[in-house]
Amino acid sequence: LVGSEMCIRDSWIGPVWDAAMFIVPMAIYHYYGDTRSIEKLWPVCTKYLAYLAGREDAEGTVTYGIGDWVFHKTQTPTEFTTTCYYYLDNLYMAKFAELIGKDGSSYAKKAEELKLLINHKYFDTSKAIYANGSQAAQGVALYLGIVPKEYEQQVADNLSTMIKANKNLLDFGVLGSKTVLRMLSKYGYADLAYQMAAQEEAPSWGNWIKQGFTTLAETWILSPKFRDASVNHMFLGDINAWMY
């Protein structure tokens, strides 16, 4: 939380969640052409990005946060997902500036620097694989436009290969649930995306239905000892938007 006179240092949730302050006003603008939310949030966004700049490590990455929350087996490195959304924040801030008549050159420059950093540190060009090779890492990099144009299809091809090797089962958390189906569809693997979406074997959306759930759970695997998470939680529900 960034206030006018104090700063509470976040050590848990992190920039992926905080990115809502950029994503929501951008969505409002795209749907309605209305910039009032951008104008209202501009001072907060300015302070927040200054705060994140102060949380960078020596390389320029931001390492805290919960990242691909409720992943199944493979955890995508938090420093990767956090820095990717730090890039998105700056990219959107530059666009906000353009829309409301502010100077966004520093944010555009920062976004480009972060994109270069992410690709230098986390992208293996010889294999066309991001980070630790997780499904979510490939989905996030493609969805946010971080992948160099000449490698986009290769990264998507590798994503499809990972999923097929995992019996068309998902292996991600909230960030993968937002990005993987969309990117499979975008790059020629809509049939594979559908097979993943229609799975009834756990972990899957279909497995919840098979078990009789009529609401979305907070985590993929449920048990009789399920006590610490919600069974009416929308954040793994982007599959609905993907369908339409």
Please describe what each predicted stretch is.
Residues 1-8:
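Short, small-residue-biased leader/transition segments that mark boundaries at the very start
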Residues 4, 35-52, 93, 99-121, ...:
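Extended, well-ordered alpha-helical scaffold segments
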Residues 50-53, 58-59, 144-147:
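Internal glycine-rich alpha/beta core junctions
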Residues 21-22, 28, 76-78, 82, ...:
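C-terminal capping/lid segments that line or modulate ligand- or cofactor-binding pockets
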Residues 29, 87, 93-94, 111:
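Heptad-repeat amphipathic alpha-helical coiled-coil interaction surface used
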Residues 9-14, 29-39, 70-82, 100:
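The substrate-binding groove and active-site-proximal loops of carbohydrate-active enzymes
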